[in-house]
């Protein structure tokens, strides 16, 4: 695997992303998260900041439900979820993705739609927010 459960324990913050699969996170990510019972029991992720992002092949392909499906286990772990506030101007103008729940991208069925400037701005804002929040939390334990 590209990441191991121990990496979650050692991270200062988590950006969790998945393509949408019928309104849910992809099965391999779900399988990975389902294996994190030891971290849940120990509280290893409690208090760490996290955000979620996704992409879909169709405009109404389940972006928000996918983001929510990734948020639920993070909440069970006691992580601090960061959304995208409406103070981000691009959230009001984007036509290709983005939600208060997290950054999204509508890639098109063939994956041929480029990331718009609004989508890029929202992703950068989310990354900046995670970085700024992770730094003060880094020494929490």
Where are these regions (language model features)?
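Glycine-rich phosphate/pyrophosphate-binding loop and the adjoining helix
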Residues: 85-141
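Helix-loop-strand module that forms the ligand-binding subsite of alpha/beta enzymes
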Residues: 1-92
């Amino acid at each position: 695997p590209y990441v191991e459960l121990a990496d979650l324990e050692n991270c200062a913050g988590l950006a969790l992303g998945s393509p949408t699969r019928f309104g849910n996170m992809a099965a391999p990510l779900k399988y990975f998260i389902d294996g994190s019972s030891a971290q849940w029991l120990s509280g290893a992720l409690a208090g760490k900041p996290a955000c979620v992002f996704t992409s879909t092949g169709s405009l109404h392909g389940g972006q928000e439900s996918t983001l929510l499906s990734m948020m639920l286990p993070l909440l069970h772990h006691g992580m601090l979820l960061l959304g995208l506030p409406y103070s981000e101007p691009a959230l009001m103008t984007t036509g290709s993705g983005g939600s208060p729940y997290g950054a999204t991208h509508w890639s098109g069925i063939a994956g041929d739609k480029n990331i718009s400037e609004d989508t890029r701005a929202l992703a950068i804002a989310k990354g900046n927010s995670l970085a700024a929040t992770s730094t003060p939390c880094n020494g929490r334990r």
